Amino acid sequence: MSKGARIKRAVVFTVSAAFAATMLTGCSQGGGDSAAGGDVTLEFAQWWEPELSDGALRGLMDDFEAANPGITVDLLSGPYASTKEQLFAGAAAGTMSDVVGLDGAWISDFAKQGALADLGPLLSDAGFDESQLSSTVVVDGETAMVPVVNFVYPLFTNDALLSEAGVSAPPSTRSEFESAAKAITALGDNTSGWVLPLSSDAPNGIQNDVMSWVWASGGSMLDDGKPDLTNDAVTSAVDYIAQLDADGVIAPGAATMKEQDKVEEFTNGRVGMMIDSLSHIATIRESNPDLTFSISAIPAEDGFSGERGIPFASWGIGVSASSEHPAEAAKLVSFLMSADTNSELSTLANAFPGNTASTPDFSDSDPLYQEAFDIYSAGYPANEFVGLPVAEQLMRDFDEQLQAALNGDQSVDEALEKSQEAWLGEF
C-alpha cells in the first residue's frame, strides 16, 4: 500500500511483480454457456449464499436478471472451505466459474496461474467508475479482485471491567491503552488487560492483533510492494507490544492461543480488551447475554491525527480469465458494486460496503454495527497481507521471531531483521 493511497479513501493493495503472472491466453473455457438466440448463463461460485438469510443472494440475482434480459446467473454455493477447493481445482484445470467469490489470501496463487481476468478494462467497458471502490487488489498493474463487502476488526472493550478499573472511556491512544490495560490487570482475580493470540498453527494474530497497531497509525509493513519490517512504524508498534508484555498486562498463554481462544477469554470476562471481527458480536451476545461491551477504533500513536487503518476481511469478487462471457461477467460485478446494490448486500451481511457511496441500513441490527460503520467511514480498510505470496507463512515467520523477542531470546530489532530476511526469501 503506497503512502499516497493511504491518504485517499480508496485504497489499492498491490502485489510484488515477482509473484504476478502474465495472464494466459488460449485458456480452456469456463463454466458459463450460451443458448440458441444468444442468451448467456453465468456461473457464480461463492460461499456467501449460505452465510446470508435464505433467498437473499438469489433475490439480488433475480434483480440483476430482470435488469439484464438474456443473462441468467447460476449460483454455485457452498461452505468457505469447499468453495476454496473448487476454485483452486478450477483454476488449475482452466474451468473456473465465470464470476468467483475470492479471499484476498488466494490472489497470489491465482495470479501465478493466470486464472483471473483484469477487472480494470472490463469494468470500464461496462461503464463502471473504479473511483467508487473503497479498495481493489492489484497484481502487477492489473485489478485481480474487488472487495464487495468488508468485515472489520475494531477494539472490543469490556464496559464493566473498564469501569471497575476507573477507566471512563475506551482508549484512543497507545498511552491510554497501556494505562487501561495496567488498571484492568491490577484488579486481580486472573483478569488481564489485553489478549494476544500468537499460535503458529493459526498465525493470523500477526495480521489482526499485531500489524493492526501499525496500520492504526497510518503505517505500513511494505515499501513499493516489498517487505519493509525494520521501518520506524513497524518497530514502534512491536516495541509497544513488547512493553505491554513486560508490563504483564497480556493474558497468559499467548504463545498457543488462537482467535477462538481469544474470543472465549473476552466473552467469559477474563480480559478487558481485544481486537476482533464484528462477525463475533452475535456469538458473544449469545454466549454471555449479561456482558456489556463497546467497540472503538484501534488506538493510534500519541499525537497521530491522520486517517486510521482498520484491519478487515472481505468477500472479494473476480472474473475468470477462462470465461467465455467476460463482458456479461463484468456487468454482474458492476451490479454488485453499484451504490444501491452494495448498500443492500452490506446490510444483509452486517458488513461494510465496497462502494464509497453506499450506506448500509443497520436500523434493525445490533447498534454496534452502526458504531463500527462510523469507525470504518472515518478511516480506511487496511490489510497488507491481501494478495501477498504465501501470506500465512509470512505471518508464521513473523510470529516465530516475535515470540523469541517476547521470551527474551533476542531484541525486537533482531526479531524484525530476521523476519525481514525470511520475508524477502518468500518474495
Identify the residue ranges that each predicted region occupies.
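A structural signal for short loop-to-beta-strand junctions that line the ligand-binding cleft
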Residues: S97-D98, A126-L162, S192, G306-G309, ...
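Short, solvent-exposed loop/beta-turn-alpha elements that line the ligand-binding surface or hinge
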Residues: A117-S131, G193-N204, A216-S236, R285-N288, ...
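C-terminal capping/gating helix-and-loop segments adjacent to ligand/active sites or protein-protein/ligand interfaces
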Residues: G354, E371-A422
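Extracytoplasmic/periplasmic substrate-recognition and gating elements
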Residues: D62, S163-A165, D239, A246-D247, ...
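Glycine-centered hinge/linker elements that transmit conformational signals in sensory
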Residues: A181-K182, D224-A254
